[in-house]
Every structure is written in structure tokens, then in C-alpha cells.
Design a protein with these regions (language model features):
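Domain-level signal for soluble alpha/beta catalytic cores
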Residues: 1-369
Length: 369
């Protein structure tokens, strides 16, 4: 067994990292108008350079910008699309025991990709990487699921199928724009697929006017549309998440409800699946994972706490997964990012880096150096 030279890597990570103290301070000052946008950008640049070096130092073969220029893992990208309007809501997104800021989006025009600030964000990352620069954007399925039909103006889209068609085209153009900027490793971050595995979330989707039994096929189709014409030398993966905010979560349930469509009908190069606790269910749904060149990245190390898992426990879980997927098609990562929003999970930066270092060590021990 060997290490991989192309992404996803044996030791990988989802993308977001805990915001550093200087960055947090600069964001507070910017919110108070004590510094201007250029001053904040300078701090972001400096802190991103530091965390890129740190990722390289712990032995990772990839580096992200930690999403240091974002407040949210998804809304920042959505708001950069034409036809999308930011809104303030009466309540935030409800997690277990905690609620997010009261922000959301609505579709007020035809959805289009006509350039995006995150293209420049990627160019900065690439210019400062000695390893493979990895960019993360939300998946097209996530664009729809949390708000459903209520998200989409019936004046703009009386036919919801046209909405999904435009979304597929917008993401396809985004993928091409990142490729043209030099991106060869792109991840689509998603909550829709894993949340559909929770019966409570499926019932809620009905109240939003959706048919949860049809959504897996719909989301697989829009993902395939987004990937049409993908260059052969570009790896595109998807991370599937049950919610990650201040170390809390939203959904639970194994992948059985979506596994056939998610793993077999989306044309992705790799899949990051959460498997850090019992809420993720067992490995049985992995029987739907196709044999061949695709990679399955097991999220066995939690990003929700600083406790280091015993290495033997992780190795045992990897061995259990090989009942369904060959070891050569497996990789290892944390179950999610460390800071899906700027608030971050409840652990220390040193604990975050210790987890990533351990993942690199485990990859060497399991797959060889």
C-alpha cells in the first residue's frame, strides 16, 4: 500500500481551521469601523500565510486558507452569485443547544456565476503554497435544502426544474473559473445529503414543500450537471456533514437513505464522510461505493473536541471499513472542519494541530510513507 500523489490524500482535512487571535481581533475592529477593509485584508493575508506553513509543517500534502476570509462556510460563496440576496431572519439556524447568527439568503433573480471574490482568494492561497492548494465551496445541493422551495422566488422560477438547471450551470462555471485560476483540488461542502438521513429532517423538508424521497435523485442530477466538462486533471470531492457549529450538530442517522445516489450517481472523485460517533451509523452503506479509482475519506477523528482518539481505535475502524471498501480506496481526515463558521469549535489551536499531525502519522502507519 502506498501514499497518494494526487488528491484526496491519505491524510487530508475538510478545510476550515480555527481563526487565530489576530484575525478575530481585526474582524472585531472592522465591524466597529476602527480599521478599513484594506487593513483587515492585510491581517487575513498574514494569518493565512502562517496557517499554510503550519499545515505543511505537520506533514499534510495539501493546504487550505482555513476559510479565514469567510464568516460562514457557505453563505459567503452564495452571496457572490448573481440573483442571490442576503437577508436577516427572525431566528438563526438551530443546533443542539445553540443558535447561529440570524442570517440567510433568498433567490431574487436568475442564478448565475459571473465572477467571484473567492477566485482571488484561491490565487492568493496558491501563490503561498508549497503543497497542493485545496479550495472549498458549498455544494449545489446545499444551496436548496435548508430553505427548500421557500428560498426560491416563484416570480423568478415558477418552474423549480429551471432553478436546478441554472444552479448546475452556475456551479459548472465556478468550477471552470477555479480551474483557470490554477485550482486542481476543489471540494464541495454539503449538509443536504447527510441531513436527509435523519427522519426528522426529512419531515421538515416536507413542510418546506419538498418530497424527500425524490431529493437524492434531484441532488445527484444537479451535482452531475455541475461536473459536466470537468478537466481530467482536476480532483473534485464532496464533504457530507450533519451540522458543525460551536462543536454542536443538527442531524443524525446512517447513510443508507442516500448512499446509492450519493456514492454511485454523483461522478465525484472522492467523498469525505463523517464517522466520528454513533450518530453516523455503521459502515454498511459503503457497499454502494464503486470499486475503482474513487477515494473514500473516513472522517474518524472528531473536530468537535480536543481529545485525541487512541490510534488503535482509529486503525480498528479503518479495518472495519475495509469489509466494504478496499484499503487502497480509503483515506483519513477529521469528520468536519474545525471552524465551519468564524466562531469555531470548542477546542484549542494546539489541539487542532495535534489532531492533524496524528492523522498524518496514522496515514504513514496504515498506508506506508
Amino acid at each position: 500500500m502506498t501514499q497518494r500523489k494526487t488528491p484526496p490524500f491519505r491524510a487530508d482535512h475538510v478545510g476550515s481551521l480555527l481563526r487565530t487571535a489576530p484575525l478575530k481581533e481585526a474582524r472585531v475592529k472592522r465591524a466597529r469601523n476602527e480599521i478599513d477593509a484594506a487593513a483587515l485584508n492585510a491581517v487575513e493575508d498574514r494569518e493565512i500565510e502562517k496557517i499554510v506553513r503550519k499545515q505543511e509543517e505537520v506533514g499534510l500534502k495539501l493546504a487550505t486558507d482555513g476559510e479565514f476570509r469567510r464568516s460562514w462556510w457557505h453563505f459567503d460563496f452564495f452571496r457572490g452569485l448573481k440573483g442571490v440576496e442576503p437577508i436577516t431572519t427572525a431566528t438563526g439556524i438551530q443546533f443542539h443547544g445553540v443558535e447561529t447568527k440570524h442570517e440567510a439568503i433568498k433567490i431574487s433573480g436568475k442564478v448565475e456565476f459571473v465572477g467571484h471574490p473567492q477566485i482571488e482568494h484561491f490565487k492568493f492561497l496558491k501563490a503561498h503554497c508549497r503543497v497542493v492548494p485545496k479550495m472549498c465551496i458549498p455544494a449545489p445541493s446545499t444551496f436548496h435544502f435548508r430553505q427548500g422551495r421557500a428560498l426560491v422566488s416563484t416570480d423568478v422560477y415558477p418552474d423549480i426544474d429551471q432553478f436546478f438547471a441554472d444552479v448546475g450551470v452556475a456551479w459548472r462555471k465556478a468550477i471552470r473559473a477555479f480551474y483557470d485560476a490554477g485550482c486542481r483540488y476543489l471540494q464541495l461542502d454539503d449538509t443536504a445529503w447527510a441531513m436527509m438521513c435523519d427522519p426528522n429532517e426529512r419531515e421538515q423538508s416536507k413542510t418546506r414543500g419538498d418530497d424527500p424521497d425524490k431529493l437524492p435523485a434531484v441532488y445527484a442530477a444537479v451535482t452531475r450537471a455541475a461536473l459536466e466538462g470537468k478537466p481530467a486533471d482536476m480532483a473534485i470531492t464532496m464533504h457530507s456533514c450533519r451540522g458543525n457549529f460551536r462543536s454542536t450538530w443538527i442531524a443524525q442517522g446512517g447513510y443508507e437513505f442516500v448512499a446509492e445516489h450519493l456514492l454511485g450517481k454523483t461522478n465525484l472523485d472522492g467523498y469525505f464522510l463523517e464517522y466520528d460517533n454513533d450518530r453516523a451509523g455503521g459502515f454498511e452503506p459503503l457497499r454502494h461505493f464503486p470499486k475503482g479509482q474513487k477515494q473514500l475519506v473516513l472522517g474518524l477523528v472528531t473536530s468537535k473536541s480536543g481529545r485525541l482518539e487512541p490510534k488503535d481505535d482509529i486503525k480498528r475502524r479503518i479495518e472495519e471499513a475495509t469489509k466494504y471498501v478496499s484499503l487502497d480506496q480509503l483515506c483519513l481526515s477529521p469528520q468536519c472542519g474545525f471552524a465551519s463558521t468564524e466562531e469555531g469549535n470548542i477546542l484549542a489551536e494546539d489541539e487542532q494541530w495535534a489532531k492533524l499531525r496524528m492523522i498524518v502519522e496514522l496515514a504513514d502507519e496504515v498506508w506506508g510513507q
